Amino acid sequence: MFNDNTNKMNRSILDIQASALVISQFTLCADTKKGRRPSFLNAESPELSKKLYEYFKVSLRKRGMLVDYGQFGSLMKVKLVNDGPVTFVLDSKQ
């Protein structure tokens, strides 16, 4: 998802030897179409979400990625620099 020398998105995080920051964020599933508060009915249960989060962490480590992690389910102040302005939403449902 990173540009090569021809400005095409042909390089991976492993190719460019960058690091990633993995943070759980259930608010990405918020439905804000109705009312004054977001609905989180589409979010997965906390139990399954934590298992998936841990699985994802292990998967990245196995691939040799340099990764830092947030603590699942905790409130955090996160400072980062995005390499963008590109954002991808990765959906595992097939």
What are these regions (language model features)?
Residues 1-17, 27-58:
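Compact, glycine-rich, soluble single-domain proteins
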Residues 31, 77-79, 87-88:
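Short active-site-adjacent structural elements
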Residues 83-94:
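Short, low-complexity, polybasic intrinsically disordered segments
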Residues 5-20, 68-81:
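Glycine/charge-rich, flexible interdomain linkers and switch-proximal surface loops
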Residues 50-79:
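Short, conserved loop-to-beta-strand elements that form functional interface hotspots
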